[in-house]
Amino acid sequence: MSKVNMRALLESFSTVILSIYPLAKSTNQQSHSHSLSLTQFLYETIRRSRVDYTTLLLALYYFIRFRDAASSKPTNYIPLLCGRRLFLVCLMAATKFLQDRSFSNRAWSRLSGLPVDKLLVLEYMFYQCIDYRLVVPKHIFARWSLLVGECCAHATARYDSTDPNVASFGSVAQYWVSLFSNVQSSLDDLFSIACLTKIAHRRMNANAALKNQATRKPSSSPQTTQDSSPILTMAPSTPVSVGSTPPSTPSVLPIAKQLAPMNVCKAHIQASNQSRTLTTASPPEQIPLMEPQVYVNPQVLPGRLSSLSKPVSLPPTPSSPKVGVYRPMTSKSNGGVAYCYNAQKLNNATGPVTFNMPFASVLPLAVSVSCDLGTASAYVASLPQPCSQKRHLEEDYSCLTEHSAKRRSYF
């Protein structure tokens, strides 16, 4: 990574960290003088920890999640309202979540200079604030990557520009601070969708311009430059210098109103040669940031599977299943589909049970019939009276004893 890209990356990360400062001001927290600037602190922490870009993105997303969780009671998390401490704790959580072998707390203590006991207290306070929700959905992480990537690209364009009329990134950093201050962690509100749509429009227009320029002759092709204007076109009321503090964060509604006059486009996707390409003939009306993800509802899935006699193709569940979530079984026989059995069907069966269901519960099924009752007559005698069709019940017991070993082998 070049020095310009590294500097732009640090500047964009600093804007995300500055977005929590209004929360720190609401608790009347005093500002302390530090020996290192925020950018220098980020550079030293990243250099010593040797983390990758994905870990940094996840750590910055934990910033937004912590800010939304602590906004209701910020006085309970005053030690974490420092940008340096919170960045260190978020980086620790992201490293431990993504990597199987990460640094210990003692190593993080030597890296940061904080005592181990203080790091443990800060880490526990952070986990308690976000309710131990470290998992980020795929579509949310894709949107967050697009948002932070645009900020990095904007900073890189400012540093690479040799035009003296182009202002530095420090003069427009206040717009990005206000953007990250109003973005919610879910990234599905009106303001977040408006910003993401505008970013997607800009990138599509830049790609279309480059494609048109490549098709023309070099002599007649005009020189086009990428638009480096900020996402928020809000002019500050007073001139702000590079070293001054950013103005107070505006509300979400005025910024969203300025982003309102924007044509949301439709995406015309053509399937050719088993690949999807975006057509540039007509303007797209919807930006497909991610392909739609279909998830299985665990409350509807058992009843649906019990009513089907043929295997169905359902999307797999996440890698870390929760209680009550269904996951696919390994294929063993019968054309690659493994047999599994339902407890209710087994208890009410009148013959050999061969339900062809491709999914089985993670938890063991609680079958009310045990196989140590002795004989079939003892099993029938244990049932409440009056009872009809005892001959079928005896057959039921024989079927259950035959399939009990098979049923246990699948779970």
UniProtKB/Swiss-Prot annotation:
Residues 210-253, 307-326 are annotated as: Disordered. Belongs to the cyclin family. Keywords: Cell cycle, Cell division, Cyclin. Essential for the control of the cell cycle at the G1/S (start) transition. Interacts with the pef1 protein kinase. The pef1/pas1 complex activates the res2/cdc10 complex. GO terms for biological process: cell division; negative regulation of G1/S transition of mitotic cell cycle; negative regulation of sister chromatid cohesion; positive regulation of L-arginine import across plasma membrane; positive regulation of L-leucine import across plasma membrane; regulation of G1/S transition of mitotic cell cycle; signal transduction; traversing start control point of mitotic cell cycle. This is G1/S-specific cyclin pas1. Residues 218-252 have a biased composition (Low complexity). GO terms for molecular function: cyclin-dependent protein serine/threonine kinase regulator activity; protein kinase binding. The keyword Cell cycle applies. SUPFAM superfamilies: Cyclin-like (SSF47954). It comes from the Eukaryota. It comes from Schizosaccharomyces pombe (strain 972 / ATCC 24843). Pfam families: Cyclin. InterPro entries: Cyclin-like_sf, Cyclin_PHO80-like. CDD domains: CYCLIN_ScPCL1-like. One of its GO terms (cellular component) is cyclin-dependent protein kinase holoenzyme complex. The keyword Cell division applies.
